[in-house]
Amino acid sequence: MTIDPGAKQDVEAWTTFTASADIPDWISKAYIDSYRGPRDDSSEATKAAEASWLPASLLTPAMLGAHYRLGRHRAAGESCVAVYRADDPAGFGPALQVVAEHGGMLMDSVTVLLHRLGIAYAAILTPVFDVHRSPTGELLRIEPKAEGTSPHLGEAWMHVALSPAVDHKGLAEVERLLPKVLADVQRVATDATALIATLSELAGEVESNAGGRFSAPDRQDVGELLRWLGDGNFLLLGYQRCRVADGMVYGEGSSGMGVLRGRTGSRPRLTDDDKLLVLAQARVGSYLRYGAYPYAIAVREYVDGSVVEHRFVGLFSVAAMNADVLEIPTISRRVREALAMAESDPSHPGQLLLDVIQTVPRPELFTLSAQRLLTMARAVVDLGSQRQALLFLRADRLQYFVSCLVYMPRDRYTTAVRMQFEDILVREFGGTRLEFTARVSESPWALMHFMVRLPEVGVAGEGAAAPPVDVSEANRIRIQGLLTEAARTWADRLIGAAAAAGSVGQADAMHYAAAFSEAYKQAVTPADAIGDIAVITELTDDSVKLVFSERDEQGVAQLTWFLGGRTASLSQLLPMLQSMGVVVLEERPFSVTRPDGLPVWIYQFKISPHPTIPLAPTVAERAATAHRFAEAVTAIWHGRVEIDRFNELVMRAGLTWQQVVLLRAYAKYLRQAGFPYSQSYIESVLNEHPATVRSLVDLFEALFVPVPSGSASNRDAQAAAAAVAADIDALVSLDTDRILRAFASLVQATLRTNYFVTRQGSARCRDVLALKLNAQLIDELPLPRPRYEIFVYSPRVEGVHLRFGPVARGGLRWSDRRDDFRTEILGLVKAQAVKNAVIVPVGAKGGFVVKRPPLPTGDPAADRDATRAEGVACYQLFISGLLDVTDNVDHATASVNPPPEVVRRDGDDAYLVVAADKGTATFSDIANDVAKSYGFWLGDAFASGGSVGYDHKAMGITARGAWEAVKRHFREIGIDTQTQDFTVVGIGDMSGDVFGNGMLLSKHIRLIAAFDHRHIFLDPNPDAAVSWAERRRMFELPRSSWSDYDRSLISEGGGVYSREQKAIPLSAQVRAVLGIDGSVDGGAAEMAPPNLIRAILRAPVDLLFNGGIGTYIKAESESDADVGDRANDPVRVNANQVRAKVIGEGGNLGVTALGRVEFDLSGGRINTDALDNSAGVDCSDHEVNIKILIDSLVSAGTVKADERTQLLESMTDEVAQLVLADNEDQNDLMGTSRANAASLLPVHAMQIKYLVAERGVNRELEALPSEKEIARRSEAGIGLTSPELATLMAHVKLGLKEEVLATELPDQDVFASRLPRYFPTALRERFTPEIRSHQLRREIVTTMLINDLVDTAGITYAFRIAEDVGVTPIDAVRTYVATDAIFGVGHIWRRIRAANLPIALSDRLTLDTRRLIDRAGRWLLNYRPQPLAVGAEINRFAAMVKALTPRMSEWLRGDDKAIVEKTAAEFASQGVPEDLAYRVSTGLYRYSLLDIIDIADIADIDAAEVADTYFALMDRLGTDGLLTAVSQLPRHDRWHSLARLAIRDDIYGALRSLCFDVLAVGEPGESSEQKIAEWEHLSASRVARARRTLDDIRASGQKDLATLSVAARQIRRMTRTSGRGISG
């Protein structure tokens, strides 16, 4: 743009811009193109990025306006400067602006000033314009800088954007100094030509020695040097001619140029008579160019008897500082002289010396003589072998500085070493500051040049002199020694320390000297590193070592943590340390590699104990604490200890980490027991009471430390228990009291532990702690409490094993309920206890959780494998923990061997068996391998179902057992599942054991729907045969799912769908078959998977078969939370919504206990899962007991080891038959119990009340009805439901088994004779003697006996007998065995079942037979000596009953005979074999054979004669009608029942007495009728009175309790004798 100088306005165009868009492009481009950022070392990309936006952001109208106003007037040779503070109204501060003549040093000088003042800048814009001004400096024209020459003056318009952080003081300094700097810049620029000319002219005069004024030996060299300097090697900043007087020089102001223009005053002289040219360095740094300290070159001249110094001030160029020494005048001559002197020394080659000289800073070379150069060069050449620092000193002649040249081996040079050198040199010379340059090249040495600036002394011009600097040889050597020591590397010191210590070899020391990182070397002294190396040497792969050092009075210590072969992050390590109760103040990680290649990580921590943890008072105690601390942290690192605040007890209570683990295990157990306090609160309580904690540990150790017999351990335990009690009694807080008392209770309740076991291979050696507990002593445990409990704890796995008796069995579950797995197991063991009622062992259950599952990798297959592997490992640890505290049995002697190193506070306990469960279905072989590793006496009988054993899935045994229940239910409603089609919905898939086998047990199944966790299967109108075949195919297909079902075989409207789908289409056929009412869902065409599953569960089908996992049906009164199966909450339904006729429970917990009751009360048919799927446990129990027998045979050599497997396999089918027989028996029992449930409700109510009071049964836990509910049902005429009856049956069996085992009954031949029948034929036939000595013979005999009793005689038999007669249940057992043998009850029962009769008929036959059992049992208890000699009674009665029974038809008369024949004919007409029909029909008459045989013995009369008389008398008196009427009396309560029994007993008793009377009056040879007639004649009055009363009763038709009581009394009045005699 052009400015009209005549314009009147003062505001030019640059000041009129109002927006960035107004700025002409050429102005913007000029500014932007000149941008310079503050970071010259930035990458080009960074600079480009900055240049793309920063300058443009600075270029504002306000900035341009201000700049223009600044440059509107500038006189020639002047510079305009403006400084803007941050709050300047201009709006773009802080900033500074300059308008000056363009010059090369302008920008550099400005940036040097800013740097020197410590002022940061963001950007510098220095556009150069062609400017035309008026003579007075007024701006006339400003244009872009033209290419080439321009008639106008080039001006630099500089704008510097300063950092916002700049302070006012800094800006003031800029404002003060910048004009002076710019003035110097202007002077240098103005005088540049004159300066060069002056130097050139002086050079010529020196060379020619004009007028003899420059005489000196080196005159020629000086002249050449001056020309060399003027040839671009020296940037001239100023010149002045000075006269010399009295050792000072005085400047001639008129001669000054550049920065020396106008300079006056005096300065010290530089030259002398011997030196024509002297080089010196200024005291003050220059602001010009790059801000270095300028050099002064003084040339002496003699003028008229006086001395003049020509002084040039300037800076050596970069080229000069790097010029070849042989090309620099003056220097080159000295160098050549030095090299010439060295030619005679072959040990120092000239080239090598020259290389050294080339490294010397060029200004220094001007001061060195040839000899000095040679000496220095030789010393440097020798430096490589000496491995030390080499120092050369030169003091400035004016004492401004000391020049220090330091050479050292290149490999010793580091920034740290250089900084140490700086400190030493500044300190030794008393310097104020220091500059340095360093040169590190390919040569073997490094060079550092330090300029130590000395303090100013005196005032210039007053002639004051600084004290001389000591640069003597002695001082040089001394300081050189200091530098050498500082230059000694850490490695040098390490090698020296290793040699002095002798514990680390030189080779290792040299290795570690190189291997340790610089960070390590800075943090660790070489002496301490020697100790670290010793630790490192001992490490192995994946090992750890902790070392304490430097503990101060406040407890702050240094902990060094060494890891071999494995690294860790600080985030991993810090929680470990913090859990110990310490505060980590500082941490430093290092790493090093051992000579053998093992990587080692070293972590240094500064730690102090938590303020609440007191320091140990003595050194010894502190050392012991440190040792325990290190061991504990080491254990934490190895995963042997968990990270929590229990670890603080190591320091607080002085415990070892093992003792802490013990307390943590007890705490974990309490949490599993439902303890109301959180773990963190428990931790706090224990940490706050270290003395009590110590006492608890002392108590535990007193109880369980293995000690020789006769020791004082018991006394120690009593004292420790007293100490614990005293500590707790002194507590004030109730919460604290409860927590610590709970710990004390657990310790006292502990029966065994593997805590002190050291045997290799034990679980304890793998950090597993097992605690066997007497649960009955632990008040904090919920009910029910098992008899034995083993809690297994480790950081990797936790688990619990609950047993309700010494011989107990149940599965081990892989639980996913880490927080409450004991609750889960307790719930399962209740069902297991009931399920085990049919087998030898009582209920047990175990479960474990995996605490450290592998982290997911994203590969599902790999994740599954990893998860399974960890589960197997934890399963093995869990079982090992159980075995650590379990007794063993010596096969040879059958003696019990306690586990080694285990103190037993209980008796022998060697029976431990396990079974598969959820998550462990395929783990049997794994469990058996663990048992074998312990030499456990059960071998592979420890876990049934292994590779050598009975494969439940292959046998289909669980499903087949469950199917017996299904068949029984359907028979009761008139459906034969094996011949008639029926509809089914199911839970499971065909790959599963129970569901897969179950859905193949009838070819008439019409499976319309099923689901598992993956799919939903729908087949609304299946073909039974076709679908059965497809299910069979899928069952045989490995790992099949419903998705493998052949879609072409599915009926119209069906399909297979993933449960992951959002919605599943609903066909009309599916809606119809599932009974989905359109009013519910509005007839939607699709349904979400959860809703469809609920519809399947509610489908109106014949059977709902559960073969899956999960709880799908609950009672309406229960919430989903009550169920405890969150995964199935979305699909669960209420039992009263289920429309299936029958539910078969092949799987566990498919229906809640209350849900079963609700389903039954709603009209459905269901048992319990424990009953339905008991075949699995029954089969496993047979397997265990068979293996125990066979293993004893193998040990004895009776059976060869290689015969064992074949023998087991050969019995598979018969074992299945034995198991299924148990299922059939139980289901028949359940059927008859259901049929009579209403009538027997009063008895059942009393029985439940007895079990609650005497056996500890919990109604709520067992889902048995309350007394209020029983009363409600009584009024409604409803009895116990089938699930309640099943539970009652189980508890009856369990109770009876326990009572029988406590007696000698199982050892008596009359009871034990049934033992062989438990085993398959192959064993019975070959090894009967060995069977009789079976390890569990008593338990097996008892189980068989009680199963037989309850299944045959009924659930209430033993209870009723005991209650009615006033005897014990054991007496009832005795009478049952006697009755069974005497009357062949078992044979009759088996024939009834084998006849395959209609359910109603078979139930009637069974109940009639039970009446015989009941009455015969009471008779034996009333008329035979007690306790009953069972064997003797059988011998007395059995043969006679068997002989007399076929003649019953001869003796029965009249109505009695007619009733029997009618009943038998009725039975026979319905398919009962005639002999069986007659045998059952005469059952109650056969009962009288006991009286008949007894009377015959007492009266010494033939039993046949007595029988004829007895039955004739019965007919004569019509007692059978009375007895029938008695049987029909109600049993509202116990008293009604007892009244019935009393009347019946009175009638039978009277009949017995009358028989005695009749036989007494009769004569031999008379018929029974004649004898009765004679008796009536002799007793006419009594008989007549009685007959009249009996006739009146019959005539009235009233047969209630009162009339029948009178009738019984009238019959009694006919008698003359008691008839109560007992024969021998």
Swiss-Prot record:
Transmembrane segments: none annotated. GO terms for biological process: glutamate catabolic process. One of its GO terms (cellular component) is cytosol. Activity is inhibited by unphosphorylated GarA. The active site is at K845. GO terms for molecular function: glutamate dehydrogenase (NAD+) activity; L-aspartate:2-oxoglutarate aminotransferase activity. The keyword GTP-binding does not apply. Catalyzes the reversible conversion of L-glutamate to 2-oxoglutarate. Belongs to the Glu/Leu/Phe/Val dehydrogenases family. This is NAD-specific glutamate dehydrogenase. It comes from Mycobacterium tuberculosis (strain ATCC 25618 / H37Rv).
